[in-house]
Amino acid sequence: MLESVVVKELQTIEEIEEVRQLEREIWASECVPVHQIVSSINNGGLVLGAYLRNELIGFNYGNAGFVDGESYLYSHMLGIKREFRELGVGELIKHRQKEIAGEMGYAKSKWTFDPLEARNGYLNFTKLRTYSKMYLPNYYGELNDPFNKLLPSDRILVEWNINDGDYLRWDSKIEELKEEAVEIILWSLSVVGLPMLDKDYTFDSNISFIKDAYLLPVPMSFQKIKVESPSLAEDWRYKTRTIFQTLFSQGYAVVHLAQKNEHVGHYLFV
């Protein structure tokens, strides 16, 4: 299927309206205004559409970013039509985005995602070979779309160097680091079969971490947990938030997500 997917830049009002329709279908919430997207496209932004036999099945919307003297492409939104998810369409779009961003003169792309969405973590870190060093608690405030409602909108900031330079520091050592890594907190299955973190574990945010690598479990089906056990979803959010913030503050970065089984994946901190 992927060989038939065409990813191209979108610029016309008609193309943008098509993107907004798909955005509404995916998130069931307010869409980015046309005038804002047009303004972004004409000022360093980039909108890509993935088409299968002339049907828009995915898109990516990014705008120019500039912080602390550094310019980059900020990839604000990646959306894939439900029936085409987990087929590699998102990865295809992101690689095309990286290629065009380089042609536009960008050296880096950044974006955010919910770290408890492990499948997104697998795409971002393991497939795309990005890294993250920053945790953003309740980044967007309260969100009411089906994916984000009922919990703080925590995010981690992903960085993707166009020339892959930073990642090369870890790339050849990933397997070795995974073998050596210490698991920060244990997990188990609840009586109804949902993954849960150790109830008796108290994380000390004042402890100094000295190992070369650590592993942090995250659920593979966080949306299911949110529906079936909101209190368990909250537990995952607040416990992992503290761990992320502590390790990032001590200079660690997330560079990989390992899928060990159907219940959890493990972020690799180095």
PLM segments and residue spans:
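Conserved active-site alpha-helix within GNAT-family acetyltransferase domains
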Residues: 115-134, 143-146
